[in-house]
C-alpha cells in the first residue's frame, strides 16, 4: 500500500505544479516542472521506484522491473492523483478562462510524433539510470529524469503541450488545458513510447533481463540501494 501512496503523492505534486504553472503562464514552467519531478523522484525512489507516470510504469513492466499487479495499482494511483491535483490547481488559481489546446488535422500527427519521441526519451532514460545493474547506488538519477522532462517541455511544449505523461494529460483535461477529444493522442503516445523504451532496453542490455536479476529488482529499482524506475 505504501508504494501506491508514494506514487499518488509524487504524481499529485507533479500535476498540481504543471497545472498552476501553465494556467498562470509562467515563463519558467519547464523549470518548475522539471524541478518538482526531480525532488519527488529523490523523495520516493526508495519506496515505489517513483514512476509518477503510466508510460514509465509500462516501460518498467515491459522491462520486467515491476509485476503486472503492481503496475495496475500504480496506474490507478497516478490517475487518481492527476484528477485530484487538477481540482486543487483549479481551486488555487481560480481561472476565469483557460486556453484549451485542441488538436486537429495535421497537428494531430505532429503532436503524436512529438509526444511519442519524448515519452520514449523519458522512459528510456529512466530505465537506464534507475533500473540498470550497471548503475547501482547512483546519485544522479533524479537530475537525469527531471532534466529530460525539462528539455522536452522546452522543445515541444508549444507543439503538443509537452505532456509525456497520461496522468498529466488527464489532469490537464480536467483543468481545461487539453480538449477531451485530444486525450487519445497522449494515451497512444504513452503506449508507443513506453513499450518501445522497455523493448529497446532489453535489446541493448541482454545480460540485464528479469530472470538474471535478484528478487529485489521486482520493485522497479536497482538491486542494492533503491533508485526509481521513475517520471
Named regions from a protein language model:
Residues 1-231:
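Membrane-interface helix-loop junctions and terminal tails of multi-pass membrane proteins
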